[in-house]
Amino acid sequence: MKILAFTAGAAKMYCGSCLRDNALAAELKRQGHDVILLPLYTPTRTDESNVSEPVVLMNGISVCLDQQAAFFRKTHRLLDRLWDAPWMLKLASQTSLEVDPHLLGAMTVSMLRGEDGFQLKEIRKLREWLEHWLWHEPRHELPPDVVTLPNSLLIGLARPIRQALQRPVCCTLQGEEIFLRQLQEPYRRQALELIRAKIHDVDGFVAVSHYSAGYWIRELGIAENHMHVVPLGINLEGYAALERAPHQPFRVGYLARVAPEKGLHVLAESYIRLRRETEFSGAVLQAAGYLAQEHRAYLRGIERHMKDAGFGAEFHYHGELDHARKIEFLNSLDLLSVPCTYDEPKGIFLLEAMAAGVPVVQPRRGAFPEILAQSGGGVLVEPDNPASLADAIYRLWKAPEERAELGRRGAEGVRAHYSVSRMAGRALEAYEKIVASVAHA
């Protein structure tokens, strides 16, 4: 199968969606399929071999400038060449900036308007690139069987892409509802209205969990026969899942982006409860993951809370980890918890932990129940409830045999149900159904 897949760069962050898009493309290539992975906005950053093309479309610098000033919405070839230069994109990707909620909301709405938005010039450049790629590149003598978009925030590109290539377009749904919920009004309402209005520009949708599929069917009114579920899968290379001996000290871990919605503060509060109210001792709380500039004060608050409680020396933040260091970090843990305060539709951090044989403790919300039901590698607790989380951690601390059994089942469950090869097989089935539905329409 020939697949043209777009992926949205996230500047210098290891983005879960980018990792998923890259892993899927790499596995499909390994299986012999012709996959072209095209970055949008910025180059992608992955913790595995990056298989994306060395080009960036819908340049993030131009997209932002087009939003802010009419001057940039006209073609200025010298400036466009400057913004498109690899060194400029690299510089922009490595720069940390405070996020302006107003600009972010307005730009989201403008991008969803597609050719009616302020980014028309960039969309025309995208169409021109695709048409040249289709007709003038010897490598691409045949058009793709299907084109995939990485999320519904880019659904405004579906119509111009379909017009340029005359091929079916599939839209992946992989967590953008969290971003939409955080938009200020009226941008959140406007964005959802635009996505609903454009669902017919897409020939099919792929959700990364059954929870996510149900959410979007209800939210957007997508027909059930247009929705396909392709659960996440991870590359298991490097994950040994060896027999795990208890560590000393006992290590409670967190591996996710450090942000309020991911719930590190909930885990810290649970840890403090355990230390104050039970004989739980000889332990440390270890955290790792990307930290944005706007969330540094949040992390400092957690560090201060741990210190004020008398346990500052038992908390350590390891920063953002590459693939090898991530596996090393997971191998050092006795259990992992990322107690999200929202309905998480993905949970790739659970798959990574369980692949390493680490039992997990998660709130009963979002995709977590289906992942743990399928894998058997952890326990569920009440959402937004530090006491419930503390009770579960305490029970597992007291029961090394149960921890070992959960770790074994989780490692087996991930290998059986959440490998990258399983994800690729399910994705191909979904793409083939979408292509067939268009052919028979």
Predicted regions and their residues:
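A short, well-ordered alpha-helix in the C-terminal region of glycosyltransferases
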Residues: 388, 395, 402-416, 423-429, ...
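Nucleotide-activated donor-binding/catalytic signature segment of Leloir-type glycosyltransferases, i.e.
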Residues: 299-321
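Conserved acidic donor-binding segment of nucleotide-sugar-dependent glycosyltransferases
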Residues: 374, 379-386, 395-400
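A conserved catalytic-core segment of Leloir-type glycosyltransferases
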Residues: 37-125
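Conserved donor-binding/catalytic core segment of Leloir-type glycosyltransferases
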Residues: 245-262, 268-271, 286
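Carbohydrate-associated surface elements
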Residues: 211, 233
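Glycosyltransferase donor-sugar binding loop
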Residues: 284-303
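Short hydrophobic beta-strand element within catalytic cores of glycosyltransferases
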Residues: 359-362
